């Protein structure tokens, strides 16, 4: 997946865009703004519009809209995963305070680079994120099957012991899927920490090189 998979992103309160980010030129912002005007303002939902080989993905929650424009080759699930990260970060930084009073585009400088970081993270970890999404879907499916089978068994008046055995079997499947999801999340955390440690090591090395060059070795004196 290339870095150009994500084209444009914004966060809006109602129809007012508070922060946006893009590295591309084009009419994506105006089309996204038009889509924003058409979104139901009261519902907490997810929407995707298709236009000119691109998807305009929206996550609406508590009066705020989170949008990302992506190439249509990128799965909707990955785009929504990006929006979930942006939403969580935005609410953590501004929820209940600055977000409710900010004016149009006033958070560009602060939150624009943050959206870029989330874009890069999703692109770099797309494979692991898709696996995690798949595991979550499997868990949801198992839960649905479990409830459906229990309802059918009750309707048929099955023996309670048989019903308990079936429930335990489905519960074991759900636990296995949950275990897989935990393993994927742990792998993502270790990879992210590894990157941070490498960057820290490089910075320390640069400081050491500068120190040696300025002091002509380790014998700095006042």
Curated annotation (Swiss-Prot):
Entry keyword annotation includes Coiled coil: yes
GO-annotated cellular components: early endosome membrane; plasma membrane
InterPro entries according to UniProt: Longin-like_dom_sf, Longin_dom, Synaptobrevin-like, Synaptobrevin-like_transport, V_SNARE_CC
Record's keyword annotation contains Transport: yes
Pfam families recorded: Longin, Synaptobrevin
Example of a GO biological process term: vesicle-mediated transport
Residue ranges annotated as Vesicular topological domain: 219-222
Tissue occurrence: Expressed in flowers, leaves, stems and roots.
Domain (v-SNARE coiled-coil homology) ranges: 131-191
Residue ranges constituting the Longin domain according to the UniProt record: 10-115
Lipid bilayer topology: Single-pass type IV membrane protein
Record key words, sorted: Cell membrane, Coiled coil, Endosome, Membrane, Protein transport, Transmembrane, Transmembrane helix, Transport
Compartment(s) of residence: Cell membrane; Early endosome membrane
Cytoplasmic side, ranges: 1-197
Chain ranges passing through the membrane: 198-218
Origin superkingdom: Eukaryota
Function of the protein: Involved in the targeting and/or fusion of transport vesicles to their target membrane.
Family of this protein: Belongs to the synaptobrevin family.
Protein name according to UniProt: Vesicle-associated membrane protein 724
